[in-house]
């Protein structure tokens, strides 16, 4: 199939992210986002995120990281020498497998909430460019949910970006972070056996 060469997470994994503001623990949900979760856990295991800075995109209330040093904007796969891209991956409630490279708008789902919604502080999302849905490679963001700024069901990222996990410890650290902060290290503390390098 089309995405067989991509890593996948068949289950859950727990990742500890040490930052210059403090430590976060995140659970990555490969049941609902196998390719996105797989790409993230694979990059964590490669040490890709260690030392990378944060950038902030105010309009979405997110704190973003994963842009490598140098000219590349994503992860260059040493095997192919190309930037590895992950398709937009969203699981619609009631479906058994995710839909790829279609926003909820494309699907006409204007009121639907994905199985993994951007509904809490510290939801992990996968970034892609404005130009394409399938060019996300390594950049991810923490959703900085604020109820008064994000009326239920009206945030702009549900159905447009893949959520792939949640911060379960350290969400107060997120509130303190700025663009001056960095990821010191990220490591998988459980569930690494659920990572498969391809289909």
For each predicted feature, which ranges?
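Cyclophilin-like peptidyl-prolyl cis-trans isomerases
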Residues: 1-199
């Amino acid at each position: 199939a089309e995405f067989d060469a991509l890593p996948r997470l068949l289950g859950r994994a727990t990742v500890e992210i040490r930052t210059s503001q403090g430590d976060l623990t995140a659970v990555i949900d490969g049941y609902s986002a196998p390719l996105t979760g797989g790409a993230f856990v694979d990059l964590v295991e490669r040490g890709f995120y260690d030392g990378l800075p944060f950038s902030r995109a105010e309009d979405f209330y997110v704190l973003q990281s994963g842009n490598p040093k140098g000219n590349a904007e994503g992860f260059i796969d040493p095997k192919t020498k190309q930037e590895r891209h992950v398709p937009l991956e969203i699981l619609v409630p009631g479906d058994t497998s995710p839909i790829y490279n279609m926003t909820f708008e494309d699907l006409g789902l204007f009121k639907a909430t994905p199985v993994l919604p951007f509904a809490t502080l510290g939801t992990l999302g996968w970034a892609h460019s404005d130009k394409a849905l399938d060019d996300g490679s390594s950049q991810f963001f923490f959703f900085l949910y604020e109820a008064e700024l994000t009326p239920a069901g009206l945030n702009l990222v549900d159905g447009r970006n893949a959520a792939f996990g949640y911060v379960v410890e350290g969400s107060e650290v997120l509130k303190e972070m700025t663009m001056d902060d960095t990821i010191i290290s990220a490591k998988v503390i459980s569930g690494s056996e659920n990572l498969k390098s391809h289909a």
